[in-house]
Amino acid sequence: MTISNLIRSRCSLAAAKSFLENVKSFSSHATFAEHKQLEKIRNIGISAHIDSGKTTLTERILFYTGRIKEMHEVKGKDNVGATMDSMELERQRGITIQSAATYTIWKDHNINIIDTPGHVDFTVEVERALRVLDGAVLVLCSVGGVQSQTLTVNRQMKRYNVPCLAFINKLDRSGANPYRVLGQMRSKLNHNAAFVQLPIGVESNCKGVIDLVKQRALYFEEPYGLKIREDEIPADMRTESAERRQELIEHLSNVDEKIGELFLEEREATVEDIMGAIRRSTLKRAFTPVLVGTALKNKGVQPLLDAVLDYLPHPGEVENVALVEKKDEEPQKVPLNPARDGKDPFVGLAFKLEAGRFGQLTYLRCYQGVLRKGDNIFNTRSGKKIRLARLVRLHSNQMEDVNEVYAGDIFALFGVDCASGDTFVTNPKLELSMESIFVPDPVVSMAIKPTNSKDRDNFAKAIARFTKEDPTFHFEYDADVKETLVSGMGELHLEIYAQRMEREYNCPVTLGKPKVAFRETLIGPCEFDYLHKKQSGGQGQYARVSGILEPLPPHQNTTIEFVDETMGTNVPKQFIPGIEKGFRQMAEKGLLSGHKLSGIKFRLQDGAHHIVDSSELAFMLAAQGAIKSVFENGSWQILEPIMMVEVTAPEEFQGTVIGQLNKRHGIITGTEGAEGWFTVYAEVPLNDMFGYAGELRSSTQGKGEFSMEYSRYSPCMPEVQEKLCHEYQVSQGLVVDKKQKKKN
């Protein structure tokens, strides 16, 4: 039925509107299902410090691009919660825990968006997201500015060479100062950054933004800022906008030759000249364009989407390489073809795992070729063959089936047994692997047990799922103290998993006190020469190993290495894996405090074998004996995790806060102040940070806040080492506890 037919039959206007809505809905669904050409694809992440407004910004993006019909707020104030916060716990806490993936269309471009967590305890989620993205939007709060997690995200973007543009959000907040934030980007992040927009008023006065490139004022009108009205720049801001535009051109001329020539020749740069220079410089990570707005008040979001298309790269502008790995050879880097023509074989990377209602959901990025429903794919790590029954694209926790995916697409598979960082190919002869995703070691452990013993089955299921999903979440059983331990990136990380066990598996758990993941290491090199010989009737055991156990440099003190330097046949090659196994088993538990060994290198230089009595087991036991001899003869020390701590509070509490950090053996690395508030940066041992949140709140009348993130491992203080050694000896029954003795 056409509109004219509806009118002729005197149907109600409501019926005509309903018909149009259905047509629009159908056409928009068809649009989302389309496959775009390479130049019309953007894979972006939205990263920032906690509470900078990332999820709210994503919600607005989805609304303006027609992906959702209505907007909801974070923290579920309207009992719905933001679309991208699909987990019940996320809606309650108002923080994003898992990166939700979605795709949308803006001006005939397909934008894949990963909304990432801002809390430091979920850093591995950000790492995974950035690994598979081509560009990112760095969201900063116009009050908080550059904060500790912003520095972390910035380092991660640098590691994966991700170009970014900055969005200074929350202009409507009291104390908003985007100019100070720009200064911090230049001083703290070392970004060559400049405004491409200026705010027209801040706080309650926030009316719109000025586009410095096109020299126009933009006002966001109608409900939800859907209509953008262009106008002349307000008279009282013309001088400032001219100065800021000149500043933008100067910053670009330092890194872009074309605009640099125009600047030196004092010729006027056109809009196209400036936009071209911004794009070229941003792709090289030589410049960061800075946009402004307030997502909550619906101002500045559409121009940000335009900037994503104008200044961030499409998959063809980013070089992605795979490694060709062959035995006993150095891996060779091979560039991947991003063309969406399917001429090259498929290569994809699994960057996230999630256990859903229908089995394991695996998020992948297609780097090369095309993948169709019904194809067979191979996991290059395990060699497993998988037949694809279903391909989906994701919109937060909702799925849309597709028949094929091309290079540059982000998609998901069901029921694929794999690990995060695995590479998939359709041609099993391709011995390729994408560079693996960097995963930090956990720094905090807690004892954990189900509150009710009848829940053990559910507890085991939850642990199995969470350890597979999150490589920074570890689980082990400590036989010495007969406790099950979970380890992670912080207290909040472990608390959230405990709450998820209760909520998702109906298994309430009890967490013990947090324990720091100390490590033991050698102070200097120590030689070993150990003979393992056993004869008790029948085949005996004979193996001799000699070499050096030495410390690794400080930047490698969280790893252990094994190197075979033997020449000739004194130690047959088939026994080398046994020696390495023996070394790695002994590295699980040190002599001083029972913690793992790290920062050491086992150099096997010589040995001896017997033609009958030698075996892999004999050499494994010889390696263990060699480590025991180094325990006795070498000099050992305990390492502890050092955290980067950032504390913000009103100026009148500065002395108190610094005093508290000094008391906790902190080293102050910097301070800064602005508008009655100060921020202090310090490096503090994690062992001294427990209970700090309560102390800070009570000493600053609830106004102080802090964040911390792992920095490195460093030797602990002598008194701490002495205490740890004594506690371990007491637990092993090697010495009697004096306090216990007095009680008895």
From Swiss-Prot:
SMART domains: EFG_C (SM00838), EFG_IV (SM00889). GO terms for biological process: mitochondrial translational elongation. Gene3D superfamilies: 3.30.230.10, 3.30.70.240, Elongation Factor G (Translational Gtpase), domain 3, P-loop containing nucleotide triphosphate hydrolases, Translation factors. Keywords: Elongation factor, GTP-binding, Mitochondrion, Nucleotide-binding, Protein biosynthesis, Transit peptide. Transmembrane segments: none annotated. Residues 39-317 form the tr-type G domain. GO terms for molecular function: GTP binding; GTPase activity; translation elongation factor activity. GO terms for cellular component: mitochondrion. GTP binds at residues 48-55, 115-119, 169-172. Belongs to the TRAFAC class translation factor GTPase superfamily. Classic translation factor GTPase family. EF-G/EF-2 subfamily. Mitochondrial GTPase that catalyzes the GTP-dependent ribosomal translocation step during translation elongation. During this step, the ribosome changes from the pre-translocational (PRE) to the post-translocational (POST) state as the newly formed A-site-bound peptidyl-tRNA and P-site-bound deacylated tRNA move to the P and E sites, respectively. Catalyzes the coordinated movement of the two tRNA molecules, the mRNA and conformational changes in the ribosome. This is Elongation factor G, mitochondrial. It comes from Anopheles gambiae (African malaria mosquito).
